Amino acid sequence: MWKLLLWVGLVLVLKHHDGAAHKLVCYFTNWAHSRPGPASILPHDLDPFLCTHLIFAFASMNNNQIVAKDLQDEKILYPEFNKLKERNRELKTLLSIGGWNFGTSRFTTMLSTFANREKFIASVISLLRTHDFDGLDLFFLYPGLRGSPMHDRWTFLFLIEELLFAFRKEALLTMRPRLLLSAAVSGVPHIVQTSYDVRFLGRLLDFINVLSYDLHGSWEKFTGHNSPLFSLPEDPKSSAYAMNYWRKLGAPSEKLIMGIPTYGRTFRLLKASKNGLQATAIGPASPGKYTKQAGFLAYFEICSFVWGAKKHWIDYQYVPYANKGKEWVGYDDAISFSYKAWFIRREHFGGAMVWTLDMDDVRGTFCGTGPFPLVYVMNDILVRAEFSSTSLPQFWLSSAVNSSSTDPERLAVTKAWTTDIKILPPGGEAGVTEIHGKCENMTITPRVTIVTPTKETVSLGKHTVALGEKTEITGATTMTSVGHQSMTPGEKALTPVGHQSELPGKKTLTPVGHQSVTTGQKTLISVGYHSVTPGEKTLTPVGHPSVTPVSHQSVSPGGMTMTPVHFQTETLRQNTMAPRRKAVAHEKVTVPSRKISVTPEGQTVPLRGEYLTSETGTHPQDG
């Protein structure tokens, strides 16, 4: 018997280290149904097998009690949303309260006394159980900022602790599964330092949704990508940096969920001819036909935009952008989604969060690649692959250019580049210049050298592409995506500045048709931040970043170092979703005493009395 238990334990350990049991957390907004025509989405339009957790955004608050935003939510949308669990009994649903437009004042009032918090908690349990939700998501943007007093940082912790205590007590009394508790948090370092005690949040919450997007947008004077996977060492604005920062501060990796947007941020260019990354911008581009927000396009709107646009790929950020005339959009597509999914698996994070499910191409009518083309990629890599008996899809994936460490060994990047690629039609077929063919099981070695989150550095030499069992010297820049065709923009081999490539015949070629700019004196990227809840109708910029523009469209990473990680690729299957095993196993945690206060210096002091006062000055409202 003990041998059987030992074997089962070993299997579970190996499964954990293989990255299994990833969460795919998807938000659905209660204003999705109000979009016109084919963009109007109701809960019954959603695929219940795509995500492990669905979160309904948002509930509101009245008189320190959680309430539905309107009667339609409670009478129609809540029941329809939770009815999805009849089709997938492993699906978990949560109700989120807050959001950008919600502000902070009602949170502050509710948090201010123990009696107010008790009243709120009782209303939460009642509402969740009445409508068959499995948990609560706290979307408080942000404790200690935007008009919230500094002591909200600690009263927010008290609320979370008291919610968890009440959820456990209710579960014991009713013999029902305990209600889940999650929170959406900023990925921007100065907001994290002001608003959160990371270790306590990591101990108490079931999972933490890191908002690792909205890192650049039309509130800035130069173009930048909304959600780059990686960035240069001097620039903390990337998804990888945000996730590593939370982990460095003590949050458990398995509880950290990386936020990924199904929308793009747009800019209006000063000059149509100056249309690269860090090009001068004069504001937001035109609103989308369905979302109707300047500076913002849902993915299903981006599919229409890129038909007549020129599409580009940012090699060191692993994300695309497109421009048409004076309009510019940075966004995520199926390729960048796959890179982000593999980054999550490789780094053993808890999973991915999608904002939002309803901004993907829900019915497959806009992009021509089937329903949910973005979220399907994430599901395929994070959820379905874990239970598949076939070999997992793999490809070369570089490590992060930047990390949360300031170790100079890990910040040895002085150059970066981008490479333009041809437009990819929504049908999934790649536009190529000479070669047009579908390549599967292709291994790509990126032409850059970059810094890893660990201290491992590897310099790449030749550009190689492995097809099956063969390895060849490439004569072109080759890209492949899961379910997409490969592209060969030209017949000449392009070599980054500072590297040489040996081709047959011992000829050495350097890049043709690309400008390379050495940023040895450091390239400064925007350091401002605009905090929003994407998709809401009022977006308020916080602060105005200052940037030093880089006047190029393409730069070369000759001095970068990189640790390649070997994976394989496979073609995406169609959107027939297979049932999955149990999605989540929640750990038991020890609840600390409610009579504590955590100071900014990390000291723990006892609190007395029911009311909380603080002598700490209010932090400037820099968002």
From Swiss-Prot:
<protein>
    <recommendedName>
        <fullName>Oviduct-specific glycoprotein</fullName>
    </recommendedName>
</protein>
<dbReference type="InterPro" id="IPR017853">
    <property type="entry name" value="Glycoside_hydrolase_SF"/>
</dbReference>
<keyword id="KW-1015">Disulfide bond</keyword>
<feature type="binding site">
    <location>
        <position position="355"/>
    </location>
    <ligand>
        <name>chitin</name>
    </ligand>
</feature>
<dbReference type="InterPro" id="IPR029070">
    <property type="entry name" value="Chitinase_insertion_sf"/>
</dbReference>
<feature type="disulfide bond">
    <location>
        <begin position="26"/>
        <end position="51"/>
    </location>
</feature>
<dbReference type="Pfam" id="PF00704">
    <property type="entry name" value="Glyco_hydro_18"/>
</dbReference>
<feature type="compositionally biased region" description="Polar residues">
    <location>
        <begin position="613"/>
        <end position="623"/>
    </location>
</feature>
<feature type="binding site">
    <location>
        <begin position="98"/>
        <end position="101"/>
    </location>
    <ligand>
        <name>chitin</name>
    </ligand>
</feature>
<dbReference type="GO" id="GO:0005576">
    <property type="term" value="C:extracellular region"/>
</dbReference>
<comment type="function">
    <text>Binds to oocyte zona pellucida in vivo. May play a role in the fertilization process and/or early embryonic development.</text>
</comment>
<keyword id="KW-0732">Signal</keyword>
<dbReference type="GO" id="GO:0006032">
    <property type="term" value="P:chitin catabolic process"/>
</dbReference>
<feature type="domain" description="GH18">
    <location>
        <begin position="22"/>
        <end position="385"/>
    </location>
</feature>
<dbReference type="GO" id="GO:0007338">
    <property type="term" value="P:single fertilization"/>
</dbReference>
<keyword id="KW-0325">Glycoprotein</keyword>
<keyword id="KW-0278">Fertilization</keyword>
<dbReference type="InterPro" id="IPR001223">
    <property type="entry name" value="Glyco_hydro18_cat"/>
</dbReference>
<dbReference type="GO" id="GO:0030133">
    <property type="term" value="C:transport vesicle"/>
</dbReference>
<dbReference type="GO" id="GO:0008061">
    <property type="term" value="F:chitin binding"/>
</dbReference>
<feature type="glycosylation site" description="N-linked (GlcNAc...) asparagine">
    <location>
        <position position="441"/>
    </location>
</feature>
<feature type="signal peptide">
    <location>
        <begin position="1"/>
        <end position="21"/>
    </location>
</feature>
<feature type="binding site">
    <location>
        <begin position="211"/>
        <end position="214"/>
    </location>
    <ligand>
        <name>chitin</name>
    </ligand>
</feature>
<feature type="region of interest" description="Disordered">
    <location>
        <begin position="539"/>
        <end position="558"/>
    </location>
</feature>
<dbReference type="GO" id="GO:0005975">
    <property type="term" value="P:carbohydrate metabolic process"/>
</dbReference>
<feature type="region of interest" description="Disordered">
    <location>
        <begin position="594"/>
        <end position="623"/>
    </location>
</feature>
<dbReference type="GO" id="GO:0004568">
    <property type="term" value="F:chitinase activity"/>
</dbReference>
<feature type="glycosylation site" description="N-linked (GlcNAc...) asparagine">
    <location>
        <position position="402"/>
    </location>
</feature>
<comment type="similarity">
    <text>Belongs to the glycosyl hydrolase 18 family.</text>
</comment>
<feature type="binding site">
    <location>
        <position position="142"/>
    </location>
    <ligand>
        <name>chitin</name>
    </ligand>
</feature>
<dbReference type="InterPro" id="IPR011583">
    <property type="entry name" value="Chitinase_II/V-like_cat"/>
</dbReference>
<dbReference type="InterPro" id="IPR050314">
    <property type="entry name" value="Glycosyl_Hydrlase_18"/>
</dbReference>
<feature type="binding site">
    <location>
        <begin position="71"/>
        <end position="72"/>
    </location>
    <ligand>
        <name>chitin</name>
    </ligand>
</feature>
<keyword id="KW-0968">Cytoplasmic vesicle</keyword>
